[in-house]
Protein backbone atom coordinates (compact mmCIF):
# COMPACT_ATOMS: atom_id res chain seq x y z
CA UNK A 1 0.00 0.00 0.00
CA UNK A 2 2.83 2.34 0.90
CA UNK A 3 4.34 1.60 -2.49
CA UNK A 4 1.10 2.35 -4.37
CA UNK A 5 0.82 5.69 -2.56
CA UNK A 6 4.19 6.68 -4.00
CA UNK A 7 3.83 5.22 -7.50
CA UNK A 8 0.21 5.71 -8.62
CA UNK A 9 0.07 8.82 -10.89
CA UNK A 10 -2.86 10.39 -9.00
CA UNK A 11 -2.07 9.20 -5.49
CA UNK A 12 1.53 10.35 -5.92
CA UNK A 13 0.36 13.98 -6.30
CA UNK A 14 -1.84 13.72 -3.20
CA UNK A 15 0.98 11.99 -1.32
CA UNK A 16 3.51 14.70 -2.16
CA UNK A 17 1.07 17.42 -1.09
CA UNK A 18 -0.59 15.89 1.98
CA UNK A 19 1.40 12.94 3.35
CA UNK A 20 5.14 12.99 2.67
CA UNK A 21 5.42 16.76 2.25
CA UNK A 22 8.44 18.00 4.26
CA UNK A 23 7.23 20.87 6.48
CA UNK A 24 9.15 23.13 8.89
CA UNK A 25 8.90 21.73 12.44
CA UNK A 26 8.19 25.13 14.00
CA UNK A 27 5.21 26.46 12.01
CA UNK A 28 2.58 27.77 14.42
CA UNK A 29 -1.21 27.83 14.43
CA UNK A 30 -1.05 30.83 12.05
CA UNK A 31 -0.16 28.33 9.32
CA UNK A 32 -3.52 26.58 9.83
CA UNK A 33 -5.55 29.18 7.95
CA UNK A 34 -4.62 27.91 4.47
CA UNK A 35 -6.24 24.53 5.13
CA UNK A 36 -9.14 26.27 6.91
CA UNK A 37 -9.74 28.28 3.73
CA UNK A 38 -9.85 25.01 1.79
CA UNK A 39 -12.46 23.74 4.24
CA UNK A 40 -14.43 26.99 3.92
CA UNK A 41 -14.41 26.70 0.12
CA UNK A 42 -15.57 23.07 0.25
CA UNK A 43 -18.33 23.96 2.73
CA UNK A 44 -19.50 26.89 0.60
CA UNK A 45 -19.53 24.86 -2.63
CA UNK A 46 -21.43 22.03 -0.95
CA UNK A 47 -24.06 24.17 0.81
CA UNK A 48 -24.29 26.42 -2.26
CA UNK A 49 -25.00 23.43 -4.50
CA UNK A 50 -27.95 22.37 -2.32
CA UNK A 51 -29.25 25.96 -2.20
CA UNK A 52 -28.99 26.24 -6.00
CA UNK A 53 -31.26 23.17 -6.31
CA UNK A 54 -34.13 25.16 -4.77
CA UNK A 55 -33.30 28.78 -5.65
CA UNK A 56 -34.86 30.60 -8.62
CA UNK A 57 -32.98 33.51 -10.19
CA UNK A 58 -35.99 35.58 -11.20
CA UNK A 59 -36.85 38.89 -9.53
CA UNK A 60 -40.47 37.88 -9.02
CA UNK A 61 -39.60 34.64 -7.19
CA UNK A 62 -36.01 34.98 -5.84
CA UNK A 63 -36.98 36.36 -2.41
CA UNK A 64 -39.85 33.85 -2.10
CA UNK A 65 -37.59 30.96 -3.10
CA UNK A 66 -35.18 31.83 -0.26
CA UNK A 67 -38.16 31.93 2.14
CA UNK A 68 -39.27 28.56 0.73
CA UNK A 69 -35.79 27.09 1.31
CA UNK A 70 -35.87 28.20 4.95
CA UNK A 71 -39.44 27.04 5.62
CA UNK A 72 -40.22 24.04 3.46
CA UNK A 73 -36.96 22.39 2.37
CA UNK A 74 -35.67 19.73 4.75
CA UNK A 75 -32.94 21.43 6.82
CA UNK A 76 -33.01 24.29 4.29
CA UNK A 77 -32.79 26.85 7.11
CA UNK A 78 -29.57 25.20 8.32
CA UNK A 79 -28.01 24.98 4.86
CA UNK A 80 -28.80 28.64 4.21
CA UNK A 81 -27.51 29.79 7.62
CA UNK A 82 -24.28 27.83 7.20
CA UNK A 83 -23.82 29.26 3.70
CA UNK A 84 -24.48 32.87 4.73
CA UNK A 85 -22.30 32.71 7.85
CA UNK A 86 -19.73 30.53 6.10
CA UNK A 87 -18.92 33.59 3.97
CA UNK A 88 -18.09 35.53 7.15
CA UNK A 89 -15.81 32.74 8.39
CA UNK A 90 -14.24 32.56 4.92
CA UNK A 91 -13.23 36.22 5.14
CA UNK A 92 -12.09 35.94 8.78
CA UNK A 93 -9.75 33.13 7.64
CA UNK A 94 -8.63 35.11 4.57
CA UNK A 95 -7.75 38.20 6.61
CA UNK A 96 -5.91 36.08 9.21
CA UNK A 97 -4.06 34.26 6.40
CA UNK A 98 -3.00 37.57 4.78
CA UNK A 99 -2.02 39.03 8.17
CA UNK A 100 0.18 35.96 8.77
CA UNK A 101 1.77 36.48 5.35
CA UNK A 102 2.47 40.15 6.10
CA UNK A 103 3.82 39.47 9.61
CA UNK A 104 6.17 36.63 8.73
CA UNK A 105 7.28 37.87 5.30
CA UNK A 106 5.61 35.04 3.36
CA UNK A 107 4.99 37.60 0.59
CA UNK A 108 8.59 37.08 -0.54
CA UNK A 109 7.32 33.96 -2.31
CA UNK A 110 6.11 36.35 -5.01
CA UNK A 111 4.19 33.94 -7.27
CA UNK A 112 2.32 32.36 -4.36
CA UNK A 113 1.56 35.82 -2.92
CA UNK A 114 0.32 37.32 -6.21
CA UNK A 115 -1.99 34.38 -6.92
CA UNK A 116 -3.21 34.81 -3.33
CA UNK A 117 -4.14 38.44 -4.08
CA UNK A 118 -5.97 37.28 -7.23
CA UNK A 119 -7.78 34.69 -5.05
CA UNK A 120 -8.80 37.47 -2.65
CA UNK A 121 -10.23 39.53 -5.53
CA UNK A 122 -12.09 36.49 -6.90
CA UNK A 123 -13.53 35.71 -3.47
CA UNK A 124 -14.65 39.32 -3.02
CA UNK A 125 -16.39 39.27 -6.41
CA UNK A 126 -18.07 35.96 -5.57
CA UNK A 127 -19.29 37.24 -2.20
CA UNK A 128 -20.60 40.44 -3.80
CA UNK A 129 -22.67 38.70 -6.51
CA UNK A 130 -23.87 36.17 -3.92
CA UNK A 131 -25.15 38.93 -1.63
CA UNK A 132 -27.42 40.13 -4.46
CA UNK A 133 -29.18 36.76 -4.89
CA UNK A 134 -31.75 36.84 -2.02
CA UNK A 135 -33.11 40.03 -3.69
CA UNK A 136 -33.74 41.90 -0.44
CA UNK A 137 -33.46 45.67 -0.09
CA UNK A 138 -29.73 45.68 0.69
CA UNK A 139 -29.11 43.12 -2.09
CA UNK A 140 -30.73 45.39 -4.67
CA UNK A 141 -29.29 48.70 -3.48
CA UNK A 142 -25.86 47.22 -2.83
CA UNK A 143 -25.81 45.91 -6.40
CA UNK A 144 -26.98 49.30 -7.72
CA UNK A 145 -24.40 51.33 -5.81
CA UNK A 146 -21.37 49.08 -6.35
CA UNK A 147 -21.98 48.37 -10.07
CA UNK A 148 -22.60 52.10 -10.56
CA UNK A 149 -19.01 52.75 -9.50
CA UNK A 150 -17.92 51.50 -12.92
CA UNK A 151 -19.55 54.58 -14.46
CA UNK A 152 -16.50 56.46 -13.10
CA UNK A 153 -14.35 54.79 -15.77
CA UNK A 154 -13.60 57.54 -18.32
CA UNK A 155 -15.33 57.37 -21.73
CA UNK A 156 -16.65 53.77 -21.53
CA UNK A 157 -18.06 53.91 -17.96
CA UNK A 158 -21.74 54.40 -18.85
CA UNK A 159 -21.73 51.67 -21.48
CA UNK A 160 -19.87 49.35 -19.10
CA UNK A 161 -22.51 49.72 -16.37
CA UNK A 162 -25.40 49.06 -18.78
CA UNK A 163 -23.51 46.07 -20.19
CA UNK A 164 -23.16 44.54 -16.68
CA UNK A 165 -26.77 45.39 -15.78
CA UNK A 166 -28.12 43.97 -19.04
CA UNK A 167 -30.41 47.01 -19.28
CA UNK A 168 -30.89 50.50 -17.91
CA UNK A 169 -31.15 49.46 -14.25
CA UNK A 170 -30.50 46.52 -11.93
CA UNK A 171 -33.24 44.16 -13.10
CA UNK A 172 -34.04 40.55 -13.96
CA UNK A 173 -31.13 40.22 -16.41
CA UNK A 174 -28.74 41.39 -13.67
CA UNK A 175 -30.00 38.85 -11.13
CA UNK A 176 -29.83 35.98 -13.64
CA UNK A 177 -26.22 36.71 -14.66
CA UNK A 178 -25.16 37.29 -11.05
CA UNK A 179 -26.49 33.83 -10.18
CA UNK A 180 -24.53 32.36 -13.11
CA UNK A 181 -21.36 34.15 -11.92
CA UNK A 182 -21.93 33.10 -8.32
CA UNK A 183 -22.20 29.46 -9.39
CA UNK A 184 -19.12 29.63 -11.63
CA UNK A 185 -16.60 31.62 -9.56
CA UNK A 186 -16.08 29.12 -6.70
CA UNK A 187 -14.79 26.60 -9.23
CA UNK A 188 -12.45 29.26 -10.66
CA UNK A 189 -11.31 29.89 -7.07
CA UNK A 190 -10.73 26.14 -6.62
CA UNK A 191 -8.59 26.08 -9.79
CA UNK A 192 -6.61 29.14 -8.65
CA UNK A 193 -6.13 27.47 -5.25
CA UNK A 194 -4.45 24.52 -6.98
CA UNK A 195 -2.05 27.00 -8.64
CA UNK A 196 -1.50 28.71 -5.28
CA UNK A 197 -0.50 25.34 -3.77
CA UNK A 198 1.59 24.42 -6.80
CA UNK A 199 3.72 27.56 -6.41
CA UNK A 200 3.90 27.13 -2.62
CA UNK A 201 5.22 23.57 -2.97
CA UNK A 202 7.93 24.82 -5.35
CA UNK A 203 9.54 26.65 -2.42
CA UNK A 204 8.08 24.99 0.68
CA UNK A 205 6.53 26.80 3.62
CA UNK A 206 8.03 29.79 5.38
CA UNK A 207 8.31 29.61 9.20
CA UNK A 208 8.06 31.98 12.20
CA UNK A 209 11.85 32.45 12.44
CA UNK A 210 12.02 33.47 8.76
CA UNK A 211 15.15 31.39 8.14
CA UNK A 212 15.85 28.33 5.98
CA UNK A 213 14.31 25.26 7.61
CA UNK A 214 15.81 22.53 5.41
CA UNK A 215 17.86 21.28 8.37
CA UNK A 216 14.75 20.61 10.46
CA UNK A 217 11.78 19.30 8.48
CA UNK A 218 9.05 16.86 9.54
CA UNK A 219 6.47 15.01 7.43
CA UNK A 220 3.09 16.66 6.96
CA UNK A 221 1.29 13.48 8.05
CA UNK A 222 0.64 12.80 10.89
CA UNK A 223 1.91 16.00 12.54
CA UNK A 224 0.21 18.72 10.54
CA UNK A 225 -2.69 16.65 9.23
CA UNK A 226 -3.87 16.23 12.84
CA UNK A 227 -3.07 19.85 13.63
CA UNK A 228 -5.23 20.87 10.65
CA UNK A 229 -8.03 18.55 11.81
CA UNK A 230 -8.03 20.29 15.19
CA UNK A 231 -8.39 23.61 13.36
CA UNK A 232 -11.25 22.13 11.29
CA UNK A 233 -13.10 21.10 14.46
CA UNK A 234 -12.58 24.52 16.06
CA UNK A 235 -13.81 26.40 12.99
CA UNK A 236 -16.79 24.14 12.30
CA UNK A 237 -17.76 24.44 15.96
CA UNK A 238 -17.68 28.24 15.66
CA UNK A 239 -19.57 28.20 12.35
CA UNK A 240 -22.32 25.84 13.49
CA UNK A 241 -22.68 27.74 16.79
CA UNK A 242 -23.16 31.00 14.89
CA UNK A 243 -25.52 29.38 12.35
CA UNK A 244 -27.64 27.78 15.08
CA UNK A 245 -27.65 30.38 17.86
CA UNK A 246 -27.27 33.76 16.11
CA UNK A 247 -27.71 33.24 12.35
CA UNK A 248 -28.65 36.88 11.65
CA UNK A 249 -26.02 38.49 13.88
CA UNK A 250 -23.79 39.57 10.98
CA UNK A 251 -26.57 40.22 8.44
CA UNK A 252 -28.45 43.43 7.64
CA UNK A 253 -32.09 43.74 8.82
CA UNK A 254 -32.92 45.58 5.55
CA UNK A 255 -32.43 42.32 3.66
CA UNK A 256 -35.57 40.87 5.28
CA UNK A 257 -37.54 43.33 3.13
CA UNK A 258 -38.04 42.36 -0.55
CA UNK A 259 -36.19 44.60 -3.03
CA UNK A 260 -38.04 47.81 -3.88
CA UNK A 261 -36.48 50.16 -6.47
CA UNK A 262 -38.74 53.00 -5.23
CA UNK A 263 -37.55 52.98 -1.60
CA UNK A 264 -33.90 53.67 -0.76
CA UNK A 265 -32.65 52.28 2.60
CA UNK A 266 -31.36 55.02 4.96
CA UNK A 267 -27.83 53.54 5.07
CA UNK A 268 -26.59 51.49 2.12
CA UNK A 269 -23.67 49.36 3.26
CA UNK A 270 -22.09 46.04 2.25
CA UNK A 271 -21.47 43.02 4.48
CA UNK A 272 -19.06 43.63 7.41
CA UNK A 273 -16.06 42.07 5.62
CA UNK A 274 -16.13 44.78 2.91
CA UNK A 275 -16.64 47.74 5.25
CA UNK A 276 -12.93 48.67 5.46
CA UNK A 277 -12.71 49.01 1.65
CA UNK A 278 -16.09 50.79 1.57
CA UNK A 279 -14.81 53.31 4.13
CA UNK A 280 -11.75 54.00 1.94
CA UNK A 281 -14.05 54.44 -1.08
CA UNK A 282 -16.26 56.93 0.79
CA UNK A 283 -13.34 58.88 2.27
CA UNK A 284 -12.55 60.45 -1.11
CA UNK A 285 -15.10 63.05 -2.28
CA UNK A 286 -14.35 62.36 -5.97
CA UNK A 287 -16.05 59.39 -7.69
CA UNK A 288 -13.13 58.20 -9.84
CA UNK A 289 -10.67 58.89 -7.01
CA UNK A 290 -12.78 56.82 -4.63
CA UNK A 291 -12.99 53.90 -7.07
CA UNK A 292 -9.21 53.96 -7.59
CA UNK A 293 -8.63 54.08 -3.82
CA UNK A 294 -11.03 51.13 -3.40
CA UNK A 295 -9.13 49.11 -6.02
CA UNK A 296 -5.74 50.06 -4.65
CA UNK A 297 -6.76 49.19 -1.08
CA UNK A 298 -6.55 45.55 -2.24
CA UNK A 299 -3.93 45.86 -5.00
CA UNK A 300 -1.51 47.55 -2.55
CA UNK A 301 -0.81 43.99 -1.35
CA UNK A 302 0.85 43.34 -4.74
CA UNK A 303 3.53 45.98 -4.08
CA UNK A 304 4.41 44.73 -0.57
CA UNK A 305 7.14 42.33 -1.85
CA UNK A 306 8.69 45.12 -3.96
CA UNK A 307 8.83 47.48 -0.96
CA UNK A 308 10.47 44.96 1.38
CA UNK A 309 13.68 46.68 2.56
CA UNK A 310 14.67 44.66 5.64
CA UNK A 311 17.51 42.14 5.76
CA UNK A 312 15.28 39.97 7.94
CA UNK A 313 12.27 38.19 6.53
CA UNK A 314 9.59 38.28 9.24
CA UNK A 315 8.76 40.69 12.04
CA UNK A 316 9.73 38.28 14.84
CA UNK A 317 12.84 40.33 15.71
CA UNK A 318 11.76 43.71 14.30
CA UNK A 319 9.96 45.79 16.99
CA UNK A 320 9.57 48.94 14.83
CA UNK A 321 7.74 47.17 12.02
CA UNK A 322 5.83 45.08 14.58
CA UNK A 323 4.41 48.32 15.95
CA UNK A 324 3.42 49.37 12.40
CA UNK A 325 1.78 45.99 11.77
CA UNK A 326 -0.44 46.24 14.86
CA UNK A 327 -1.19 49.88 13.99
CA UNK A 328 -2.40 48.61 10.60
CA UNK A 329 -4.62 46.01 12.30
CA UNK A 330 -6.13 48.71 14.55
CA UNK A 331 -6.52 51.00 11.52
CA UNK A 332 -8.44 48.32 9.61
CA UNK A 333 -10.77 47.83 12.59
CA UNK A 334 -11.39 51.60 12.66
CA UNK A 335 -12.08 51.58 8.89
CA UNK A 336 -14.50 48.66 9.36
CA UNK A 337 -16.35 50.63 12.04
CA UNK A 338 -16.44 53.82 9.90
CA UNK A 339 -17.72 51.89 6.85
CA UNK A 340 -20.87 51.02 8.79
CA UNK A 341 -21.47 54.58 10.01
CA UNK A 342 -23.49 57.32 8.26
CA UNK A 343 -21.60 59.91 6.18
CA UNK A 344 -21.53 62.77 8.69
CA UNK A 345 -19.16 64.51 11.10
CA UNK A 346 -17.00 63.18 12.82
CA UNK A 347 -17.09 59.90 10.85
CA UNK A 348 -16.01 61.53 7.57
CA UNK A 349 -12.75 62.95 8.95
CA UNK A 350 -11.97 59.79 10.98
CA UNK A 351 -12.42 57.71 7.80
CA UNK A 352 -10.16 60.05 5.80
CA UNK A 353 -7.40 59.97 8.43
CA UNK A 354 -7.67 56.16 8.74
CA UNK A 355 -7.48 55.80 4.92
CA UNK A 356 -4.35 57.97 4.73
CA UNK A 357 -2.75 55.95 7.56
CA UNK A 358 -3.65 52.67 5.78
CA UNK A 359 -1.78 53.60 2.59
CA UNK A 360 1.05 55.40 4.42
CA UNK A 361 1.90 52.29 6.46
CA UNK A 362 2.08 50.10 3.34
CA UNK A 363 3.84 52.52 0.99
CA UNK A 364 6.02 54.72 3.24
CA UNK A 365 6.37 53.73 6.89
CA UNK A 366 6.97 49.97 6.54
CA UNK A 367 9.82 50.36 3.98
CA UNK A 368 11.34 53.16 6.10
CA UNK A 369 11.11 51.07 9.28
CA UNK A 370 12.82 48.16 7.50
CA UNK A 371 15.62 50.47 6.40
CA UNK A 372 15.96 51.93 9.92
CA UNK A 373 16.15 48.43 11.43
CA UNK A 374 18.93 47.53 8.98
CA UNK A 375 20.84 50.60 10.16
CA UNK A 376 20.26 49.62 13.80
CA UNK A 377 21.73 46.17 13.05
CA UNK A 378 24.87 47.83 11.64
CA UNK A 379 25.33 49.92 14.80
CA UNK A 380 25.23 46.99 17.22
UniProtKB/Swiss-Prot annotation:
Positions that bind a ubiquinone: 201
Residues where heme b b566 binds: 97, 196
Name of this chain's protein: Cytochrome b
Cell compartments where the protein resides: Mitochondrion inner membrane
Annotated Gene Ontology cellular component terms: mitochondrial inner membrane; respiratory chain complex III
Other comments on record: Heme 1 (or BL or b562) is low-potential and absorbs at about 562 nm, and heme 2 (or BH or b566) is high-potential and absorbs at about 566 nm.
Membrane topology of the entry: Multi-pass membrane protein
UniProt remark on cofactor binding: Binds 2 heme b groups non-covalently.
Residues reported in the UniProt entry to bind heme b b562: 83, 182
Pfam families, per the entry: Cytochrom_B_C (PF00032), Cytochrome_B (PF00033)
Cofactor: heme b
Domain of life: Eukaryota
GO biological process: mitochondrial electron transport, ubiquinol to cytochrome c
GO molecular function: metal ion binding; ubiquinol-cytochrome-c reductase activity
UniProt function note: Component of the ubiquinol-cytochrome c reductase complex (complex III or cytochrome b-c1 complex) that is part of the mitochondrial respiratory chain. The b-c1 complex mediates electron transfer from ubiquinol to cytochrome c. Contributes to the generation of a proton gradient across the mitochondrial membrane that is then used for ATP synthesis.
Organism the protein comes from: Salmo salar
Record keywords: Electron transport, Heme, Iron, Membrane, Metal-binding, Mitochondrion, Mitochondrion inner membrane, Respiratory chain, Transmembrane, Transmembrane helix, Transport, Ubiquinone
InterPro entries reported for this sequence: Cyt_b/b6_C, Cyt_b/b6_C_sf, Cyt_b/b6_N, Cytb/b6-like_sf, Cytochrome_b, Cytochrome_b_C_euk/bac, Cytochrome_b_N_euk/bac, Di-haem_cyt_TM
Transmembrane segments: 33-53, 77-98, 113-133, 178-198, 226-246, 288-308, 320-340, 347-367
Record text on subunit structure and interactions: The cytochrome bc1 complex contains 3 respiratory subunits (MT-CYB, CYC1 and UQCRFS1), 2 core proteins (UQCRC1 and UQCRC2) and probably 6 low-molecular weight proteins.
Family, as annotated: Belongs to the cytochrome b family.
Amino acid sequence: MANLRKTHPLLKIANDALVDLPAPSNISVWWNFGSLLGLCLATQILTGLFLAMHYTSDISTAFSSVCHICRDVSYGWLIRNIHANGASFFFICIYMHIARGLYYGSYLYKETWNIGVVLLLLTMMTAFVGYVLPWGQMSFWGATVITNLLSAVPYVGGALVQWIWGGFSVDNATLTRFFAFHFLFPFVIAAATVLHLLFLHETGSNNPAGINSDADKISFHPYFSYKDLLGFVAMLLGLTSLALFAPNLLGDPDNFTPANPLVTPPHIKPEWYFLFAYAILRSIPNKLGGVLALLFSILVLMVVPILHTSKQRGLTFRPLTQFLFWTLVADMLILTWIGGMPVEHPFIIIGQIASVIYFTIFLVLAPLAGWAENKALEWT
